[in-house]
Amino acid sequence: MLFIVFTILTCIGVKEKSNVDMQTASIKDMFKALVQNDQAMTVVITIVVVNMALYITSNLIIYFFKYDLGGINWNDGYALFNMVGGGTQILAMMILYPFLRNLCKLNNIKIFYVSVCMSIFGYVVLLIMATMGVNNVLPMLVPGVLIMASAGMNNVIITVFLANTVDYGELKNNRRDESVIFSMQTFVVKLASGVSVFIASMALELLKLKNLSDAVTDDAIDFSASVSAASKMGLRLVMTLIPIAGLIFALIWFKKHYILTDQKVEEIAAEVKARNA
């Protein structure tokens, strides 16, 4: 109680004196700055779609192991898949991206294309394996590694792309909206997460898997035995074809609208520096 009282007194009684007359941006100005920066909008839309693809799969993968692969040890397979996928994502950020960038001498745009194509290939392999009736987790790790390695590289590349749009926006709009642009990354990730949860929930409802997932929690039961072949196929298609469609759209959208190559970024940085000199 004393802590709360003294904290309130400190907040009320101690005020920082600021001698800086700083113009702050309103919410309207923030969205206006984002809309006026076409390259930032391109990257933001790309982030939303790419993350939606990943989150749809991550939301449904537990149901895939539980109701499709099945078996009484499905939870062990799911845990192994998650562990390998998470480790792969970290290693991709730390090792694979620097390898492609520094040793293979690929620019960030080409790395992004490689990353998205790798993810699409992973989804295709996952769908083929599931359709062929593969029920062992070890082969499933192959597409999992491809998808999560792509996700790890995308985490790095998207941040770089956003950073590139800051100087572009300053040159175009005479305002450096750095905080606005980078704050949008968190917002769009949350947006993608929310939309993907909605899609996953709708899929579970339509495939009649939602009630099953809430009803029984006994790990010693093979849940896949009570699921129809149509529901299993529907689950496979939702968690692979929708992400594939999203990634293809993101690839086409990005290729059509993003213009900030490494050379262009250097030119813009030089122009901004000369303007501010």
Q: How should each PLM-predicted stretch be described?
A:
Residues M1-A277:
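Membrane-embedded alpha-helical bundles of multi-pass transporters/translocases
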